[in-house]
């Protein structure tokens, strides 16, 4: 019945109810409130650039107690409940990290960083949902783990809102302890280490308990990350502590076998931290007690030494070395996307590691000394450096070619070969989709040397539709199509464990045909990525090293 034909008093009541409902809906749209198992949180509506839509953002939700005092170098504990409605409209503080590394990289890339504070109290997560999402929506969930060598990074460094809005997905971006506070280990019961990984487990457990309140499906969780974030994802696949906490995994330029991010022993880091801190090194319990008393500034001073810091085999999160766990097929059989970029060590990684000036000065004359040092860093006998020359440099005298081949060698060793190895192990238990991102991004090439192709991390901009710290992307029409395609692949995978759908170029599963997807403005299916290099690193080189050791042993006996 039309309102005009209702009795006067009933018309007033009906109109009042309509106005109330509109007010409540408008209020929820602008300042949505959601429950968690520890209390309520108020978010905000955030308009998504270059779209007509937006998301609800709930920022700085605690998933653990502040890891301070006795909780420094200790497993995370559940957060305390709060009364009233918690404000979730501002970014949380970043975990303690060497800020100078961020600033130097930012200057090189012409990035303007937002003013985000740092604190040891940093175990928070951000949630981005489509505006219609509410309890019962049952949307797929993606949990983003940032990269940064396990020493830098934050939940705010990547703007995930466009992916959430465009693809109707709930996205959670988490933080975890970094550097010494995140990964220092005494190698015994006093401080087993891997605190940052344990923080990630705590965040995934929080998601299982709470994500339904935000419209997410706890039984359809995909974890994804780049670089050290990809290494983290890969490590969760291997960890018994992460069982049942996720159902799909995406590893972008990072897996658990990355050489600088995993170690059998904590000895080197232990001695370095003990020396820098001035704490007694002979007694691990006393050392931890001493380190817990150090100020924020003293911890930051120690952190400055580490460009990267390795996780350790702690017997709990990682029961054995990742290589052993993969070889014995002791991992969670979940569908995976694994990928690398064409030029992994083209620019960003060497600069981050302080190798860019060394590479720029490589000539045929300086090459032997550089390779000898590099072999030592790779934990290879210095005598085998000539094998690296034969495989990558050959007889060329041209400095630019030598430098390019050196960068390729680094990229293969650090990223490509480990990714291929992990993919080959995992495909026996669950589907694996492999990619190589090949596109030279127009929006960043003007700040890089001309030799750089698809550099480490370039694919992330096309997954999220934004670069670091929401840097504006001025994409070409072809790049816009590539962005939409990659967002759709990632979202399809989050929905059903398969990136394919109608209208997209077919992405074959990685089987014994070794097919993979070449991601570019003209995508294509490739076969047997770097097969010769894989053979060199996994068979030829180890065999030659064994022969070298055998001949040295015989010589020693004589």
Swiss-Prot record:
Family: Belongs to the type-B carboxylesterase/lipase family.
Gene3D superfamilies registered for this protein in UniProt: alpha/beta hydrolase
InterPro entries: AB_hydrolase_fold, CarbesteraseB, Carboxylesterase_B_AS, Carboxylesterase_B_CS, Type-B_Carboxylest/Lipase
UniProt organism field: Mus musculus (Mouse)
Glycosylation sites per record: 275, 361
Main location (coarse class): other
Superkingdom of origin: Eukaryota
Subcellular location: Microsome
Gene coding for it: Ces2a
Keyword Hydrolase: yes
BP-aspect Gene Ontology terms: protein glycosylation
GO molecular function: all-trans-retinyl-palmitate hydrolase, all-trans-retinol forming activity; carboxylesterase activity; trans-permethrin hydrolase activity
Annotated positions of the N6-succinyllysine modification: 209, 296
A cellular component annotation (GO) from this entry: endoplasmic reticulum
EC number(s) on file: 3.1.1.88, 3.1.1.-
Protein name, per record: Pyrethroid hydrolase Ces2a
Stated role: Carboxylesterases that catalyzes the hydrolysis of pyrethroids pesticides. Hydrolyzes permethrin faster than cypermethrin. Hydrolyzes retinyl esters.
Disulphide linkage map: 95-122, 279-290
Keyword terms: Disulfide bond, Endoplasmic reticulum, Glycoprotein, Hydrolase, Microsome, Serine esterase, Signal
Catalytic residue list: 227, 344, 456
Signal peptide segment: 1-26
Group of enzyme by EC: hydrolase
Catalytic activity entry: (-)-trans-permethrin + H2O = (3-phenoxyphenyl)methanol + (1S,3R)-3-(2,2-dichlorovinyl)-2,2-dimethylcyclopropanecarboxylate + H(+); all-trans-retinyl hexadecanoate + H2O = all-trans-retinol + hexadecanoate + H(+)
